Amino acid sequence: MIESDRIITASPFSSQEEVIERALRPVQLDDYVGQEKIREQLKIFIEAARLRQEALDHVLLFGPPGLGKTTLAHIIAREMGVNLRQTSGPVLERAGDLAALLTNLETNDVLFIDEIHRLSPVVEEILYPAMEDYQLDIMIGEGAAARSVKIDLPSFTLVGATTRAGMLTNPLRDRFGIVSRLEFYTADELGKIVTRSAGLLNVDVTADGAREIACRSRGTPRIANRLLRRVRDFAEVRANGRIDRPVADAALQMLDVDATGLDVLDRKLLLAVLEKFGGGPVGVDNLAAAINEERDTIEEVLEPYLIQQGFLQRTPRGRMATTMAYQHFDIIPSHQTTVPSLFDPD
């Protein structure tokens, strides 16, 4: 299975879906559900910056995909009353690409760089003085005739987003004044998000119907909204258009998303650990080969949720299935297997 084909992937499927997602995004912090600590911190920091008529400190947002990093970047710009310029690390191939963006910023604007961990070293070097001193330091000419030129920039806020905070260099990470980790959402929070999105989409959903979708959304708003749209389709064709718990359950079973939010690929990974490797430990490269997936897909897409839910444990010797994984598949461990619980030390 290709990761982008999964109904429960946190990555956008298409430009059309991105348009729908934008329509469902909250536009101010008061409408933002979840991430309470981050939301309260940003309220204070934004209000203080506005009172001083200064740019907000540079902000680094990190965590698994689909949790609202892009949404928060848009909200920050809106709450500050400034423009948002958006790009991504892979797009900024040359120093000139970043220089063009920086020189077109207006005072206190927000520059949002998604996947900031994928910036090239040469682009990152340009970013250091821009973040620290609001200056652009570029080289003009080549060889003996080359000279450094400093260009003053307006004050601005860089908002960086990444799913791989550990891949950021220390000099870049240290230049962010506000660093926030986004966590998976609770079922209650996702239920509120599903209910809000259903209202915007004119979908009739009951509280228990919204809860059923929320419980299978892997703690991720983007997945919750995607499942809501697919359950809506099912309800319109197979039911009376109203989403209650039985309708949501039937639709999600059809989509092969089980009660814990696991799909075919999740189950394939866990069963490989359980059956092919005796519950582990198994190295990630061997595991990737066993299920015919990329290492990055396992580390960035599958593992975070499986570990967070207690199905998988990452140890110095490799990945191990937990007691919960054995119970989920009704598999009895062999007597040789030492099964870790969620609270065993790594």
Curated annotation (Swiss-Prot):
Its EC number is 3.6.4.-. GO terms for cellular component: cytoplasm; Holliday junction resolvase complex. The keyword Hydrolase applies. GO terms for biological process: DNA recombination; DNA repair. ATP binds at L24, R25, G66, K69, T70, T71, E132, D133, Y134, R175, Y185, R222. The RuvA-RuvB-RuvC complex processes Holliday junction (HJ) DNA during genetic recombination and DNA repair, while the RuvA-RuvB complex plays an important role in the rescue of blocked DNA replication forks via replication fork reversal (RFR). RuvA specifically binds to HJ cruciform DNA, conferring on it an open structure. The RuvB hexamer acts as an ATP-dependent pump, pulling dsDNA into and through the RuvAB complex. RuvB forms 2 homohexamers on either side of HJ DNA bound by 1 or 2 RuvA tetramers; 4 subunits per hexamer contact DNA at a time. HAMAP family: DNA_HJ_migration_RuvB. Residues 186-256 are annotated as: Small ATPAse domain (RuvB-S). It catalyses: ATP + H2O = ADP + phosphate + H(+). It is found in: Cytoplasm. Residues 4-185 are annotated as: Large ATPase domain (RuvB-L). Has 3 domains, the large (RuvB-L) and small ATPase (RuvB-S) domains and the C-terminal head (RuvB-H) domain. The head domain binds DNA, while the ATPase domains jointly bind ATP, ADP or are empty depending on the state of the subunit in the translocation cycle. During a single DNA translocation step the structure of each domain remains the same, but their relative positions change. Keywords: ATP-binding, Cytoplasm, DNA damage, DNA recombination, DNA repair, DNA-binding, Hydrolase, Nucleotide-binding. This is Holliday junction branch migration complex subunit RuvB. Pfam families: AAA_lid_4, RuvB_C, RuvB_N. Belongs to the RuvB family. Mg(2+) binds at T70. CDD domains: AAA. The gene is ruvB. NCBIfam families: PRK00080.1, ruvB. Residues 259-346 are annotated as: Head domain (RuvB-H). Homohexamer. Forms an RuvA(8)-RuvB(12)-Holliday junction (HJ) complex. HJ DNA is sandwiched between 2 RuvA tetramers; dsDNA enters through RuvA and exits via RuvB. An RuvB hexamer assembles on each DNA strand where it exits the tetramer. Each RuvB hexamer is contacted by two RuvA subunits (via domain III) on 2 adjacent RuvB subunits; this complex drives branch migration. In the full resolvosome a probable DNA-RuvA(4)-RuvB(12)-RuvC(2) complex forms which resolves the HJ.
